[in-house]
């Protein structure tokens, strides 16, 4: 950006069944790294490989279909839709070959959507609109949505931001269980060091675009 390298010469691996924390100050290059992995930003050089498949140069939706999921610092759901409909929409997107093929999600893979909600403890609230949920519950729904494409790698951008300590621990314990149950690889950024030390299997530190 502006002639400066936001990320320069970094290299690391994330194994299946592992939570890897990527930490560093604001502006260190964490978000840039995430955006290169999921195709939102191009890289000048290098390689990003998932299960033997090169991701660099691919479009974000193609990378998503190949098995890279993401959650965001501010949870993203359709507030006017129910919890169940949000997950059904994600499943419909995962199944559709073209956006123009989307149809109403009301009956789409209901059982699969309910199974995902059960994994995050939200099946009892399936018919509630997301607009009335507590924020901790919205984060659980977002996690279920992120599982819709059966990801091999999940990117979690400051997953516990804005959450109370009890909610933080519940969300990360739930994430840890998904890692175990699904053999999922998770790369997450986090500013709360208590969360990092409690839940990360490994920690890498980024500063000024370089690993230290």
Give the ranges of each region predicted by the language model.
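Glycine-rich phosphate-binding loops of nucleotide-dependent enzymes
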Residues: 1-212
């Amino acid at each position: 950006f502006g002639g400066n390298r936001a990320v320069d010469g970094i290299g690391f691996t994330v194994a299946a069944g592992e939570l890897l924390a990527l930490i560093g100050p604001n502006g260190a290059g964490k978000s840039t790294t995430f955006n290169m992995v999921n195709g939102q930003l191009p890289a000048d050089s290098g390689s990003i490989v998932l299960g033997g498949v090169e991701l660099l140069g691919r479009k974000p939706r193609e990378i998503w279909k190949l098995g890279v999921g993401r959650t965001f610092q501010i949870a993203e759901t359709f507030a006017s839709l129910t919890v169940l409909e949000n997950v059904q929409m994600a499943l419909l997107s995962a199944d559709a070959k073209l956006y123009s093929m989307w149809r109403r999600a009301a009956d789409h893979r209901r059982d699969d959507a309910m199974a995902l909600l059960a994994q995050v403890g939200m099946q009892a609230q399936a018919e509630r609109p997301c607009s009335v949920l507590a924020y901790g519950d919205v984060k659980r729904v977002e996690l279920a949505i992120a599982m819709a494409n059966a990801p091999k790698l999940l990117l979690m951008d400051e997953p516990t931001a804005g959450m109370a300590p009890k909610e933080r621990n519940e969300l990360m314990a739930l994430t840890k269980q998904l890692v175990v149950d699904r053999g999922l690889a998770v790369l997450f950024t986090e500013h709360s060091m208590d969360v990092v030390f409690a839940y990360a299997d490994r920690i890498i530190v980024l500063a000024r675009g370089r690993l230290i």
